[in-house]
Amino acid sequence: MATPSMMPQWSYMHIAGQDASEYLSPGLVQFARATDTYFTLGNKFRNPTVAPTHDVTTDRSQRLTLRFVPVDREDTTYSYKARFTLAVGDNRVLDMASSYFDIRGVLDRGPSFKPYSGTAYNSLAPKGAPNASQWSDNAKLNTFAQAPYLSDTITAADGIKVGTDTAQAGAAVYANKTYQPEPQVGPSEWNTSIENVKAGGRALKQTTAMQPCYGSYARPTNEHGGQSKDDNIELKFFDSANNAANTAQVVFYTEDVNLEMPDTHLVFKPTVTNGTIASESLLGQQAAPNRANYIAFRDNFIGLMYYNSTGNMGVLAGQASQLNAVVDLQDRNTELSYQLMLDALGDRTRYFSLWNSAVDSYDPDVRVIENHGVEDELPNYCFPLSAVGEIKNYKGIKPDNGGGGGWTADNTVSEANHIGIGNIAAMEINLQANLWRSFLYSNVGLYLPDDLKYTPGNIKLPDNKNTYEYMNGRVTAPGLVDTYVNIGARWSPDVMDNVNPFNHHRNAGLRYRSMLLGNGRFVPFHIQVPQKFFAIRNLLLLPGSYTYEWNFRKDVNMILQSTLGNDLRVDGASVRFDNIALYANFFPMAHNTASTLEAMLRNDTNDQSFNDYLCAANMLYPIPANATSVPISIPSRNWAAFRGWSFTRLKTKETPSLGSGFDPYFVYSGTIPYLDGTFYLNHTFKKVSIMFDSSVSWPGNDRLLTPNEFEIKRSVDGEGYNVAQCNMTKDWFLIQMLSHYNIGYQGFYIPESYKDRMYSFFRNFQPMSRQVVDTTEYKNYKKVTVEFQHNNSGFVGYLGPTMREGQAYPANYPYPLIGQTAVESITQKKFLCDRVMWRIPFSSNFMSMGALTDLGQNMLYANSAHALDMTFEVDPMDEPTLLYVLFEVFDVVRIHQPHRGVIEAVYLRTPFSAGNATT
């Protein structure tokens, strides 16, 4: 192999093929040459990919896909290894690009899986409404219930009458107590009279623990829908409290049921004696729905196959030589490379179910809130079903014909006419404001950092903060993200900026992947998983016999993704692989074409060479909690073929250790930015300085700001260096436009759509600004904390998503920033830029920008090797994070198959490392 020098030797990075003129008809060749200036065929007719038109003689030649079954399996606690023997016959070429692993197994998503918002059970019930219940107080039984079924007869022995038997001369039919009276049956007209009638209903005994009706479920125990546990249904009879005659007017069929709350939990529970399951106080319990938690395989099955982990990789080796062509480096990021490559090839917003390809996303209206208030100019009313006001009974009268202008009773008119006086009774609700407030609480409030939440009183949550039960049970004071917070501004709540926005139930990609598996906890799955490793992903495998094996993870936190990022190991998820097969295609070529291709590729000048799409050395540097400076050093080396830096920031909690087969400290299952590209901490960088040795000034002093230093954002901008109404510097904006789109100092314009990809700068750049009270200039400012702020008092719960309390009273927060009485304010600016990796390009042009030597040469050219020192200044974060830096180099593999069953690989990566599989 050629020795790397100042410029990459592209002469050995190609696949040579027959020129079209060697095998196309002379007429077509002449046509191509004559029309080449305006109708270029390029290499459209390269020999290796020409389809067969003759010599296809056997059924095997025409069989497109072959199924390989493993010759060896190894199923362990943490992984599943499958080994295949690939036998490629004469005059065949196996297309590794078409191969995929076909995996069948069983997935248990665990009890934390909840693929919807809200509840499936009694979702229309008020959150604090109880079920029909009984309890004992002072040795007496109390009942709180509704009796909806109306009849004309109640007997002590048979209960309430539900009909007559026409076959037996109108004999009365009484309720079958196992399911009648049914709770869903009552008067079907609003004007049904309840005077002088008998009524019946069902109620839960005091031995069934009280729960709110919202979210309550009890399984049926008979085909009629009855729910009694044991058919021990007791009839309890009641009469009006002021009726001395003691006649049965109401009967309740009381029972014990298997009462559950499958998808809700309590957010308010009154204080009761320990062990109490039914009491008058418990009627006031309040339920809330469990938080949505979609669980699915990751985008493009990230994490399922082992990459970047020594000892857990795979093998592709010729059986004649046993040389493994798979040589991975610890600092190569195959998964991220595949994500970015797919984005460059197509539209990632289009889902492709075959590879589980549905990219992680978030609702931009949740990340950056445009709080433009609510359009509630007209009031919204609700009316009683009768559409009248308060009704009183009136009798009919008529003028007294006896004269004198008097009145007398009208015996032709009823003595009980139901008449309301004045306007129709109505209640008002501000639908728009309630919908907006509910949106903010469900989408922002519930995702606030845990230190801004609290555990409701009398509710016991587990100590492990990574469990679903803990995350689900914590509640937020709605005032932190209410309709009036930042009203009129386009601003992201500051406390949410460093919270992973992709771990959200509005992550449409995760929701799609979860629904692909279905809506149940237990899933027998059948998936197709592609090979992503760049050296063998697109390989043409020539005739011979090869060993191909790979490891598949079984760690649920790595292979599954959840909305909340809870620890799926603790929360009961599991996966089992029952069968892994390999499907692969032979090129459908004529035999003589295939043999020509084979002969061509056996020639060592026609080796197959592949670039890793990312082409970078990946390095992670720890940033301790609350640290603001990160120095890194690279020892002296030749920087030829170096292309620049990309960098971002990751949370340690969200980054697994890929060097080990199983990371016991990875107790998280949300998105893994390191692997899937869901970066979101770019806004936390302040500046970066770059020094080649101490003597080299790079990139020179002809930029806006200090040499050797790239200022990303500045909070105080006296000179006016910031851009776009935010705190990003013009310098950094230009560098990003230059490195992503080649739009540099020649001006500002929007990049073409084909360049502005999902992971690029311009699409994800979100500048924003707002005004806040100037606490120094506004003399009447008082720092009123959340617990003492009131706005909508009397109409909302106090510091929680609970029943409204309080009285109507003037609000004391926030200070007005508009109108005649606007207070003094200051402007705050910031930006977000998710999914992107900041880039600093390094090229021959940039090398020339350094200080010149006496000989007129740049120091970087004059010396063959230089050490690199970089210092990153970042915003402090209260948890450990990682600086993720890509050193963009050339990462190339050259595959050589000189003989049958022999495969050799040479890896070239300059200027960082090289390796080979030939020795």
From Swiss-Prot:
In-chain residues carrying the UniProt-annotated modification Phosphotyrosine: 907
Regulation: induction: Expressed in the late phase of the viral replicative cycle.
GO BP annotation list: microtubule-dependent intracellular transport of viral material towards nucleus; symbiont entry into host cell
Record PTM N-acetylalanine, positions in chain: 2
Domain of life of the native organism: Viruses
Keyword Acetylation: yes
Function, as annotated: Major capsid protein that self-associates to form 240 hexon trimers, each in the shape of a hexagon, building most of the pseudo T=25 capsid. Assembled into trimeric units with the help of the chaperone shutoff protein. Transported by pre-protein VI to the nucleus where it associates with other structural proteins to form an empty capsid. Might be involved, through its interaction with host dyneins, in the intracellular microtubule-dependent transport of incoming viral capsid to the nucleus.
Subunit structure: Homotrimer. Interacts with the capsid vertex protein; this interaction binds the peripentonal hexons to the neighboring penton base. Interacts with the hexon-linking protein; this interaction tethers the hexons surrounding the penton to those situated in the central plate of the facet. Interacts with the hexon-interlacing protein; this interaction lashes the hexons together. Interacts with host dyneins DYNC1LI1 and DYNC1I2; this interaction might be involved in intracellular microtubule-dependent transport of incoming viral capsid.
Note: All late proteins expressed from the major late promoter are produced by alternative splicing and alternative polyadenylation of the same gene giving rise to non-overlapping ORFs. A leader sequence is present in the N-terminus of all these mRNAs and is recognized by the viral shutoff protein to provide expression although conventional translation via ribosome scanning from the cap has been shut off in the host cell.
Name of this chain's protein: Hexon protein
Lineage, uppermost ranks: Viruses, Varidnaviria, Bamfordvirae, Preplasmiviricota, Tectiliviricetes
